[in-house]
Structures are given as structure tokens and as C-alpha cells.
């Protein structure tokens, strides 16, 4: 018996040091989509990427923490460039690609906010409808 994947998804979050990580994240996303298509050519591929627009972030690695601060202008510029590259490079590799933008610090009391909650909810809902439609047509 062979099991085939009908829907496969990959999710990446870029919280800090966006441009240092972008190539690794893009390779991970596109590689996942291509790998899934090789194994299950008719599979529906879904990509999610989340980009943090916050000026502050504390990264954690084991017991060590790494606080990062960027100016508001730098945070906006770096996040916008990251989002542009994700859409341009990773987006076409997937049947559906959803970019999520947020602000979070990873510092107590752990504030979190979507940049455009209503827009993200609408985009997510529309993607679900398109995925369901693709599923009905393919399977």
C-alpha cells in the first residue's frame, strides 16, 4: 500500500535578522514545495510565511537570550523587503501562499498583534475556499 499526500503545507516564521535568514527560509519553503510535488505530483501545496515587523525581539537559544533592537524605519524597511522576497521567490512554488505580518517581542508580557487582522482573516478564508475547490477538482 502506498500513501499519497493530497495536501502538504510548510510554515516559516521570520522573527528577527530577516535578511540574514531569508535565503535559508526561501530554500526551505521552495524545497519543501518541490519535494512534495516530486512525491505526489497532484498534491496541493500550501505555503505560509510570517514576518515580524516589531522593532524589538528577544531570541532564545537554550538558556541564552539575544535581545535585538532596530529603529522603526529599519524594522519597516527590512520587513517589507523580506515580505517582497517571500512573495516573489517562494510564492510561485506553491498552489497557495499566504504571507502573515505581525508584531511580537518575545518579551514578557508577550504582546502580539497582526498588522492587518481583518485582511489576514479575509486572505486566509479565501485561501481555504480555493484549496477546497482545488481538492474537489483534483481528488
Feature locations, PLM:
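Surface-exposed cleft-lining segments at the edges of enzyme active sites
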Residues: 12-24
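C-terminal tail/extension regions appended to the core domain(s) of diverse proteins
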Residues: 55-139
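Nucleic-acid nuclease catalytic cores
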Residues: 38-60
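Generic beta-strand structural signal
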Residues: 5-7, 34, 41-45
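Structural beta-sheet core signal
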Residues: 8, 46-49, 99
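Conserved catalytic cores of phosphodiester-cleaving nucleases, focusing on short active-site segments
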Residues: 1, 5-15, 29
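Short, charged, amphipathic alpha-helix that recurs within catalytic cores of restriction-modification
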Residues: 22-39, 85
Amino acid at each position: 500500500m502506498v500513501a499519497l499526500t493530497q495536501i502538504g503545507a510548510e510554515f516559516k516564521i521570520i522573527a528577527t535578522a530577516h535578511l540574514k535568514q531569508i535565503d535559508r527560509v526561501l530554500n526551505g519553503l521552495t524545497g519543501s514545495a518541490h519535494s512534495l510535488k516530486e512525491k505526489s505530483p497532484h498534491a496541493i501545496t500550501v505555503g505560509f510565511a510570517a514576518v515580524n515587523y516589531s522593532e524589538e525581539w528577544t531570541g532564545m537559544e537554550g538558556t541564552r537570550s539575544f535581545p535585538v533592537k532596530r529603529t522603526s524605519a529599519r524594522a519597516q524597511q527590512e520587513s517589507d523587503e523580506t515580505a517582497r522576497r517571500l512573495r516573489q521567490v517562494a510564492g510561485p512554488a506553491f498552489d497557495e501562499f499566504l504571507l502573515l505580518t505581525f508584531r511580537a517581542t518575545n518579551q514578557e508580557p508577550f504582546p502580539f498583534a497582526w498588522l492587518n487582522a481583518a485582511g489576514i482573516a479575509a486572505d486566509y478564508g479565501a485561501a481555504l475556499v480555493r484549496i477546497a475547490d482545488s481538492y474537489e477538482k483534483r481528488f
